[in-house]
């Protein structure tokens, strides 16, 4: 459950280390985002010579949450951190590698690139 002002780790090699959610996209008064939802973020920590700079505003897709994902069979998949993958304006990943596991809930037409780059899909 990601909301405004939530800090997330970045799970790709775009150069950002930490981002902060500034808006949950989709709906006029939408409060929370879960795995697979697109949010607007600002970069709070970045490495030198990365593709993104501190203070930059971008879109991101949530790939891991501490709250977890409930599956139709009743199982629950939780993670140790909240993480996101940065997207460009065409909603394609900025980085070329994904770090850590991602869930099958991303397996839509929009995020197949993230699924294929991920080392582990739960």
Curated annotation (Swiss-Prot):
<protein>
    <recommendedName>
        <fullName>Large ribosomal subunit protein uL14</fullName>
    </recommendedName>
</protein>
<dbReference type="GO" id="GO:0022625">
    <property type="term" value="C:cytosolic large ribosomal subunit"/>
</dbReference>
<keyword id="KW-0699">rRNA-binding</keyword>
<comment type="subunit">
    <text>Part of the 50S ribosomal subunit. Forms a cluster with proteins L3 and L19. In the 70S ribosome, L14 and L19 interact and together make contacts with the 16S rRNA in bridges B5 and B8.</text>
</comment>
<comment type="similarity">
    <text>Belongs to the universal ribosomal protein uL14 family.</text>
</comment>
<dbReference type="InterPro" id="IPR019972">
    <property type="entry name" value="Ribosomal_uL14_CS"/>
</dbReference>
<dbReference type="Pfam" id="PF00238">
    <property type="entry name" value="Ribosomal_L14"/>
</dbReference>
<dbReference type="GO" id="GO:0003735">
    <property type="term" value="F:structural constituent of ribosome"/>
</dbReference>
<dbReference type="GO" id="GO:0006412">
    <property type="term" value="P:translation"/>
</dbReference>
<dbReference type="InterPro" id="IPR005745">
    <property type="entry name" value="Ribosomal_uL14_bac-type"/>
</dbReference>
<dbReference type="InterPro" id="IPR036853">
    <property type="entry name" value="Ribosomal_uL14_sf"/>
</dbReference>
<comment type="function">
    <text>Binds to 23S rRNA. Forms part of two intersubunit bridges in the 70S ribosome.</text>
</comment>
<keyword id="KW-0689">Ribosomal protein</keyword>
<dbReference type="GO" id="GO:0070180">
    <property type="term" value="F:large ribosomal subunit rRNA binding"/>
</dbReference>
<keyword id="KW-0687">Ribonucleoprotein</keyword>
<dbReference type="InterPro" id="IPR000218">
    <property type="entry name" value="Ribosomal_uL14"/>
</dbReference>
<keyword id="KW-0694">RNA-binding</keyword>
